[in-house]
A protein has these predicted regions:
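Active-site nucleotide/adenylate-binding loops and adjacent lid/helix of ATP-dependent enzymes
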Residues: 1-8, 15-111, 156-163
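A short, surface-exposed helix-loop junction/capping segment
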Residues: 13, 69-71, 143-147
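Short strand-connecting beta-turns/loops that link adjacent beta-strands
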Residues: 69, 121, 189-190
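ATP-dependent carboxylate activation and anion-phosphoryl transfer catalytic cores
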Residues: 156-224
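Phosphate-binding site of ATP-dependent enzymes
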Residues: 77-172, 193
Length: 224
């Protein structure tokens, strides 16, 4: 689809950027760039599943998800439920996915996530997203989880982390994308870590800042 659309029109976030970003294995590159990311274990095979089971990873409070998904689809939290976690991972592997396992970040229950939206590499606005994963399968409205979004000013540490991510993206691809969203949460050490980098049609949540739509329009016009 990306190749087809690229020949018919101009993608401001290029096909290569979107293709790279739609697979959460990009997180490994952020780690290699010494950017703080939630600890992430990739499960690619039944052998990997046996290994993490023997290590006791599934006995903890964890989040399991596929590397390629949208709207938290097939994402579940397993709170010290190794049998259910193993079944979920087995389901994802059988479906042909690579899966990831991350420790659940308990600070998210207190203060949610912070999302920062960037247009042409500049921070436009930020917001708070409430915790959406209860233990077990998350509730969904169709394919997408219902989200609680409210205005929030990103902290200095969060902004520094977001800027580091955007600098990495520019260095890797030679330019800033038209739009980007960096979702962060306070990690176990009390400092922000990246949950996700969204470069493929993320929700901008423009409603949290009445000037955000104008900033996005200006960013689009600046590329003409």
């Amino acid at each position: 689809w990306l190749d087809s659309v690229s020949t018919a029109t101009t993608l401001q976030n290029s096909a290569d950027i979107i293709r790279w970003n739609t697979n959460k294995e990009y997180l490994t590159e952020l780690v290699e760039a010494q950017i703080g990311v939630i600890p992430t274990t990739f499960v690619r095979s039944a052998e990997d599943l046996v290994t993490i089971t023997n290590e006791g990873m599934l006995e903890r409070d964890i989040v399991v998800k596929p590397t390629i998904s949208a709207g938290s689809n097939n994402t579940e939290r397993h709170e010290e439920s190794p049998v259910k976690a193993a079944a979920h991972l087995g389901f994802l592997l059988d479906a042909g996915f690579v899966a990831i396992v991350q420790p659940y970040q308990r600070f998210i229950d207190e203060r949610g996530e912070t999302g920062m939206v960037y247009f042409n590499g500049q921070l436009s606005h930020s917001f708070r997203k409430g915790a959406i994963l209860a233990t077990g399968e998350n509730e969904e409205n169709g394919l997408f989880t219902v989200e609680e979004i409210t205005p929030r000013n990103a902290s200095g540490q969060e902004r520094e982390l977001g800027e580091a991510v955007m600098s990495f993206v520019k260095k890797k691809w030679g330019e800033y994308p038209l739009y980007a969203r960096v979702d962060v949460v306070r990690g176990s050490a009390g400092v922000p870590v990246v949950m996700e980098l969204e470069l493929a049609e993320p929700s901008f949540f423009l409603q949290v800042d009445h000037e955000a739509p104008s900033r996005f329009a200006a960013a689009v016009m600046a590329r003409r």
